[in-house]
């Protein structure tokens, strides 16, 4: 009987000592700085190539592989949240505002920058799906990295950004794991930095105001609706910095909301039933009118040159067009403005 109790006691002790419990402890810092102190970054881009993302050649960020110590089957993922205002988007990713001129793209995630999640909006989102540690001790880390973005059209300038709170990452236990009273959230601030921003553009060589004398014609030269006759021609010439692609938009000065391809005649015109169309070079399709804006992707914006041309030019042809309302002879006047976008 005595030996039986000794055997049972030995087995009980063996089973007891193999039992392990999921555990977590915080070994990081609750406040963390992103990027080097007083960083300085320089880049050159076309004036209207906006938003322009600075590619510094290295990550402006913070990473730490040892923020939480975990063991015994503990399961952990990560959520992230950005507190800065959303001022735009790029390829589905939010651009967050720092100043009127400078914004940020932000990634959050596990320790490796390459696995970071592109952040959008201001809600908590899953930035690392997670894993479960085995019956051993390991750590869970995190990372944050950013890229500065130029937001507005401007001349070459230097922009200084002060230290700014970005947002937070929190540890997310799952699969029955619990953090208890352990610190789960860490915060991030972007260190102050300077952007040395150099922009490239073009200079207009032709006068900024161009008067095109329209030829006199007879109504018989435009017998049917849609018929056209060349009325006049002119050219625009520019001198550009290397690498600049020029785009242009025509705007109807009399009716700025006009998005058609027929220019509205001014109130000084006395002819009716006739309009004006503008063609470039040898194109067979007339140009349409758009908003007076240099923004990339502006409605009815068209490409004037490629980035390899430093002295681009365009030949413009103005044509009378029968609008189908019955032509009454008289004077014809129209005003169109040109807005160049340097991309």
UniProtKB/Swiss-Prot annotation:
Q: What does this protein do?
A: Essential fimbrial adhesion factor that mediates binding to N-acetylglucosamine-containing receptors in the host intestinal microvilli, leading to colonization of the intestinal tissue, and diarrhea or septicemia. Also confers adhesiveness to laminin and basement membranes. May be involved in the initiation of polymerization of fimbrillin monomers during fimbrial filament biogenesis.
The observed outcome of changing residue 110 to L is: 80% reduction in binding to N-acetyl-D-glucosamine
Q: Tell me, what is an example of a GO biological process annotation in this record?
A: cell adhesion involved in single-species biofilm formation
Query: Region Disordered: which residues?
Result: 287-307
List the biased-composition ranges (Polar residues): 298-307
Q: What is this protein called?
A: F17g-G fimbrial adhesin
Residues engaged in binding a carbohydrate: 65-66, 110-111, 138-141
Return the annotated region ranges for Fimbrillin-binding domain: 200-343
Q: Which InterPro entries does its entry note?
A: Adhesion_dom_fimbrial, Adhesion_dom_fimbrial_sf, Adhesion_dom_sf, Bact_Fimbrial_Adh_Pro, Fimbrial_adhesin_lectin_dom
